[in-house]
Amino acid sequence: VTWCRGAAYYTESGWRGSLKTEGGGVLINQSVHTQDLLCFLLGDPTTVDATMTNHHLKDVIEVEDTLEAYIDFNGVHASFYATTSYCADVAPLIEIACENMTIRVEDPHVTVYPKDAAPYQLSVETLPPIGKSYWGTGHTACISDFYQSLRDNRRFSLNLETMEPSIRLMLGTYESARSGHSVTLIEQ
């Protein structure tokens, strides 16, 4: 997740950039949904080793503007990077390297790069994004699914139980970055 947030973004709000009112920086505000997607795609995270820093707004905010983490999903490893010190707002990128292919997700595009064949794009049905284009289409899909669950009289697919791995990962990422040590999220 590489986005651009200048001083005005923080100073013109009454809560951004403060640990007390925001709870954190780039992870909890800009990139938590990318961690959500990693949990959705890779399963329950088991350990995380993270670092965080404030590179470009040291005199403006007290939270991190850059965070990186090495996450283990029960033997599947992920490298996670997020910053608000980039020069532009770019759609989040998730790349999954498998034995025989690499899958690249850049909302709303999914491209498959087979090991021994030409790359191709998967057809993904999406709704128009809400807000800025680099926010992606996930919010629109989530809101649409919520309303559809009400119409269908079914349980909404996202709840505390389904989001627990993602919340555990976010909190563990912060704990690891603050302590300087790897954090075990669930015993294997």
Language model region names:
Residues 34-35, 140-144, 170-171:
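A general structural signal for well-ordered alpha-helical segments in protein cores
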Residues 1-60, 180:
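Predominantly a Rossmann-like dinucleotide-binding segment in NAD(P)-dependent oxidoreductases
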Residues 57-64, 73-141, 159, 187:
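NAD(P)-dinucleotide binding in Rossmann-like oxidoreductases
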Residues 15, 139, 143-148:
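C-terminal helix-to-coil terminal segments
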Residues 23-25, 130-134, 152-156:
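Active-site rim elements
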Residues 30-33, 138, 158-161, 165:
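A generic structural signal for residues located within well-ordered alpha-helices
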Residues 147-188:
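C-terminal helix-rich "cap/oligomerization" subdomain common to oxidoreductases
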